[in-house]
Amino acid sequence: MTMNSCADNSTKTNEADAVLENIFNRKSVRSFTSEPVSEEHIETMLKAAMAAPTAVNYQPWRFVVVTDRAQLDAMAEVLPYAKMLRQAPLAIVVCGETTWFDGKENPYWQQDCSAATENLLLAAEALGLGAVWTGVYPNMELAGPLGEFLGLPETVQPLCAIPIGHHDGTTKPRDKWKPENVHYGKW
């Protein structure tokens, strides 16, 4: 084994440790300071979201970035489970194009946009920001009004709204490992 291969293995181990630490430290943060999120951080989170896997590389995700205080407050009225929007300086609404190239229904947009959402949440954690996934779709009592509020085209559905901001660090990650939920070979 050469010195370079040892260094390469060490680097890969350190990178793997950093990735896993970020995953295990991710938490749902519902309380934010008023400090704005930089445009650089917003772009980094969006780039991470768009790096998600996607069926046939269709990339159906669309994002609505909301930083206007009045609009965030109004969104909190539209989404009863997202009252923390009143504190958050930023929300990113993850939406999906529900049709394929040929106009037929895209049955994978929810999966693709969910993967993008998780990447966005992990990027927020890596940047030292707090965020929480607030579900919207498939509840049309939420998706319909939010889509109208945001002026979404007919073929675009809001999957979730992600309030994002700086936090005080009091929210701690939870250990969600439950071996009884794992089955090998068959149920």
Model-derived features: where do they sit?
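Acidic, surface-exposed loops and disordered segments
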Residues: M1-W187
